[in-house]
Amino acid sequence: MADPQLITTAFDLPGYRIERSLGVARGIVVRSRSIVGTFGASIQTLFGGNISLYTSLCERARQDAYERMIEEARQMGGNAIVGMRYDATEIASGVTEVLCYGTAVQAVRAG
């Protein structure tokens, strides 16, 4: 499995040498809002500020997508991920796809 310290949005790993690029690893999660959550969030919008119900939903979706990406990188034989990114798309009303992706690599300590 990729070491959490060896996952970066950069395209290099200071102190490591990338020996092999294994391709794109990705984790995809599709989430929908519940009726109760949508109602609660609607109430929060009346008062302004952070809509904590949606923030929590987004954080869970991103974490799940991140963990799925790590698992795919591990299955590909990678121990690190470079160029990691998130993307989110509303694919239907109230249904959002969260994608976490990066390049799975085999990295070794330099030096």
Swiss-Prot record:
<dbReference type="Pfam" id="PF01906">
    <property type="entry name" value="YbjQ_1"/>
</dbReference>
<protein>
    <recommendedName>
        <fullName>UPF0145 protein BTH_I2656</fullName>
    </recommendedName>
</protein>
<dbReference type="InterPro" id="IPR002765">
    <property type="entry name" value="UPF0145_YbjQ-like"/>
</dbReference>
<comment type="similarity">
    <text>Belongs to the UPF0145 family.</text>
</comment>
<dbReference type="InterPro" id="IPR035439">
    <property type="entry name" value="UPF0145_dom_sf"/>
</dbReference>
